[in-house]
């Protein structure tokens, strides 16, 4: 399910990055770091009032060696294109500037919800004239100190209040399939082959070659939205306006997808950039299919396929649940299997396991492989149940969660996948002490 997107916009030195860090720290659940996965500092997930949303720090994508006006233009473009809510941040210590007024004119044209926040406010020493800021036309400002946390709760309350509902954000009822990968792995060629193979394209949604371009295709009476993202490049290469914009579009496209196709070039070795791109989808907990493209360029295919699969599994250990398909977009070899794999994932996402059946599998798993001693005791699982379907989530009631060894958790996950068919779908297993 797509999350809402919040963009923090403002001129330099108003505290955008400080506010970004403050909001991200407000998230109550901390996700464990995973080897091979990197998180870009301009993009993060937060939670407030049980609502998860994505935060974009436009301060993290300022242009180098560019005039100030172009920097503001890039920030506004990103906000207009991607955000569901825009936080317009001002600096109380410096007051309202001409640059602030220029940004306000740009943001006013977006017709999107604007939350006006005035940062660097110290209520003990500062005078405040709210009418000066209300003259911008965005209503009453919220006074905050991002550094000290003053007023950030009120700000988050207003953000959630202004954000569209889950239903409105996810109003496209087609299965949204995004195709991600580094440049030149054949993403656009694959989309063209899929559309050409089916010969049933419904429409093309206009975009540019640097944007994520949507195409709608119908297969077996099921409509899919295929999203071809611009190639994600190494961060060190992302200097120009268009490249930074493209990178951010790829990140937000992953957020809006139901299934992600991670494309690799099977004819060359896997790179760190490939694994980092896969990590973007992994962190968003998206169902993933790994597409090894350009298989037509590989010689001795029968001999090489096992080697290549082992290489992929070694580099993408955190995507052990993902299915691997070897295809050629150029000669259309095996590309129809992609839709079959997507439908398998759709089925898995809708699957709800009966508690009685689930516990039978759980008991058999413990007989096959009893839990080892760990942290001074042995894990005993009393019973479990599925509590959520879309991201399959299982709660297991145990004697002590501290006795769970990571390898045994992985064993249980593999058994659940094997018995119930959750290939390609991320899964969550929660251990709770029985009371």
Swiss-Prot record:
GO annotation, biological process: ribosome biogenesis
The record's listing under InterPro entries reads:
G_ENGA, GTP-bd, GTPase_Der, KH_dom-like, KH_dom-like_a/b, P-loop_NTPase, Small_GTP-bd
Record: residues binding GTP 1: 10-17, 57-61, 119-122
Q: Which UniProt keywords apply?
A: GTP-binding, Nucleotide-binding, Repeat, Ribosome biogenesis
Q: Which molecular function terms from Gene Ontology are attached? A: GTP binding; ribosome binding
Q: Where is the KH-like domain?
A: 351-435
Q: Where is the EngA-type G domain?
A: 4-167, 175-350
Pfam families, per the entry: KH_dom-like (PF14714), MMR_HSR1 (PF01926)
Give residues annotated as binding GTP 2. 181-188, 228-232, 293-296
Q: Write down the HAMAP family for this protein, in alphabetical order.
A: GTPase_Der (MF_00195)
Describe the function of this protein: GTPase that plays an essential role in the late steps of ribosome biogenesis.
Q: Which family does it belong to?
A: Belongs to the TRAFAC class TrmE-Era-EngA-EngB-Septin-like GTPase superfamily. EngA (Der) GTPase family.
Q: What is this protein called?
A: GTPase Der
Species this protein is from: Mesoplasma florum (strain ATCC 33453 / NBRC 100688 / NCTC 11704 / L1)
